[in-house]
Amino acid sequence: MIIIMDNGGQYVHRIWRTLRYLGVEAKIIPNTTPLDEIKAMKPKGIIFSGGPSLENTGNCEKILEHYEEFNVPILGICLGHQLIAKFFGGEVGRGEKAEYSLVEIEIIDENDIFKGLPRKVRVWESHMDEVKKLPPKFKLLARSDTCPVEAMKHEELPIYGVQFHPEVAHTEHGADILRNFAKICGEL
């Protein structure tokens, strides 16, 4: 099962629906769910959803603090991506302009999260803030003309972040990205 931490984003149910469509068991839980309850669910992976504010990410940061107790792949989407970057020492700030549109990203490193995708993909973005600088020990996976860090991965741990929304129908190959994450988790 993949746990989806609900950070109050408008697309959180789309993440769940896409995973279910792919045949993956998934569950949306409040981001305030205690760590012991999350551990008892024995997730194979965790997704940090998008949301309105880094100040309202509940226990997501605690999951990162206690990563060795979970030891499962993590995917941060939009706000979740920013949270991961900030936690590991990256820089998050306002973008040059708010993005609420389709953006073409360039995949720099196919990696396992983008396996089988073309080098350029149009994705849906819905954010004001963005990762301005990669955290130490992270690799850049994708970028765009409007955002320097569209996707990243920890060099040693299966921790990923994407600025865009793979769960939204407008994102080309979005279901493939979530399928690849489910494969990384051993759920497909």
From Swiss-Prot:
Disulfide bridge map: none
Top-level enzyme category: ligase
Catalytic reaction equation(s): XMP + L-glutamine + ATP + H2O = GMP + L-glutamate + AMP + diphosphate + 2 H(+)
Alphabetically ordered keywords of this record: ATP-binding, Glutamine amidotransferase, GMP biosynthesis, Ligase, Nucleotide-binding, Purine biosynthesis
One GO term describing the cellular component: cytosol
E.C. number(s) listed in UniProt: 6.3.5.2
Active site, per annotation: C78 (nucleophile), H165, E167
Coiled coil feature spans: none
The Glutamine amidotransferase type-1 domain, residue ranges: 1-188
Cross-referenced SUPFAM superfamilies: Class I glutamine amidotransferase-like
A GO molecular-function descriptor: GMP synthase activity
Metabolic or biological pathway, per its Swiss-Prot or TrEMBL entry: Purine metabolism; GMP biosynthesis; GMP from XMP (L-Gln route): step 1/1
HAMAP family per UniProt: GMP_synthase_A
NCBIfam families assigned: guaA_Nterm (TIGR00888), PRK00758.1 (NF001975)
Subunit structure, interactors included: Heterodimer composed of a glutamine amidotransferase subunit (A) and a GMP-binding subunit (B).
Chain's role: Catalyzes the synthesis of GMP from XMP.
Protein name according to UniProt: GMP synthase [glutamine-hydrolyzing] subunit A
Organism name: Pyrococcus furiosus (strain ATCC 43587 / DSM 3638 / JCM 8422 / Vc1)
